[in-house]
Amino acid sequence: MVNIINLWNGIVPMVQDVNVASITAFKSMIDETWDKKIEANTCISRKHRNIIHEVIRDFMKAYPKMDENRKSPLGAPMQWLTQYYILKNEYYKTMLAYDNESLNTKFKTLNIYMITNVGQYILYIVFCIISGKNHNGTPYIYDSEITSNNKNLINDRIKYACKQILHGQLTMALRIRNKFMFIGSPMYLWFNVNGSHVYHEIYDGNVGFHNKEIGRLLYAFMYYLSISDRFLNDFALLKFTYLGESWTFSLSVPEYILYGLGYSVFDTIEKFSNDAILVYIKTNNRNGYDYVEFNKKGIVKVTETKPDNDKRIHAIRLINNSTDVQHIHFGFRNMVIIDNECANIQSSVENATDTGHHQDSKINIKDDDVDDDDYNPKPTPIPEPYPRPPFPRHEYYKRPKLLHVEEPDPVKKDADRIRLDNHILNTLDHNLNSIGHYCCDTAAVDRLEHHIETLGQYAVILARKINMQSLLFPWLLPTVHPHAIDGSIPPHGRSTIL
């Protein structure tokens, strides 16, 4: 009860907001999946993934106010790592006490070597995470170490906790021979932890884990973090922040990364370039996905209503990202989003496919900001040529006369536009061959080469459009690849690539 004297003196105790709804949903999920056997292709459904995601985020959000004399001088997030703070966390206490402590009672009966069902798996991993204890019952960080200045000690303890959460999930996957069960390891367990070290220590040190067919999503999660550091400095294209925990990315961010770390597309996102990003937020009624697009650098915020658990998606696809083409497959549509059908999940970067875009929808379209070529047929402009230097050089001869390049006409029929494209390409090819021998115009040659490549991209875009509108595409739709010279993508082809 609140003390009336304290209220009179204006002293109001801090009250933690506990999202009981996520606890109720978690309890229902555990009951629903408690007897569901884990088989080779069993996965956690989208609805259940989002329930788990909410539980971990709500636990983080409910951390108690930290004592001034009980903070880490190293900046470690002790509010989620030590029993001193976790036992004060109102969400954690409510979770343990919920439904006459039924969840905690079930958790106490489990150990990592006897779990065979989905509900057991989820309850065990989630309770290990929010309890701040390793599988052997030891705390992530002892209370006496909260104010420790021993950087090596604290970093080693957090790294061990992060690694054993992932190792435990792989151990269960290997024993059951399962491919797709996956929860991950939350962002705060990666404090000063090198993803590459964790990846190699787990996979290089365990012969049984060498079969990448087992625990595919876990492998994909750790492999991604092994090649992409948490803080990329000048190379970062995106930064996510939740409760002060930041993470930067230079690649497309698949759903299993945001889900596994505990981030959401509804968090604070900062863009460091003007290249477009597609932020996938939910499923639609065409077996596809809805996304919002952002083009300008700075803080971006998804303002759409947060979808229900069975529809919500967390994934970001980078467009026009030419910084690391070898990792472009992370942005392939069927790699960046986890399919809700277990058997259709794609977790192999090398074998990922990029089909199905015609089922997706951009949902933040504005009348003055439409990139589709139905509404904006104006082609990419050709730069004006620079003036030729006025002085003659050795072996100078008169500049050859170039053929006139016909202007595109957007109102023509598709067949006429294709013939016109071919005519323009032939004209440009003739001009390129003529001017290529003219030593003064190497810059003009470069511009012609660039424009020919751009026209090739538009030809692919046009072919895709014809196939999609006629619904006649018995083979995979052609992909618009990044420009061979500068890696750019015409605005009309953004939704078809990366």
Curated annotation (Swiss-Prot):
Disulfide bonds join C43-C342. It is found in: Virion membrane. GO terms for cellular component: membrane; virion membrane. Residues 378-390 have a biased composition (Pro residues). Transmembrane segments: none annotated. Residues 355-367 have a biased composition (Basic and acidic residues). Keywords: Disulfide bond, Membrane, Phosphoprotein, Virion. Pfam families: Pox_A30L_A26L. Residues 352-391 are annotated as: Disordered. It comes from the Viruses. Belongs to the orthopoxvirus OPG153 protein family. Interacts with proteins OPG094 and OPG143. Interacts with OPG154. Interacts with OPG152. Interacts with host laminin. This is Envelop protein OPG153.
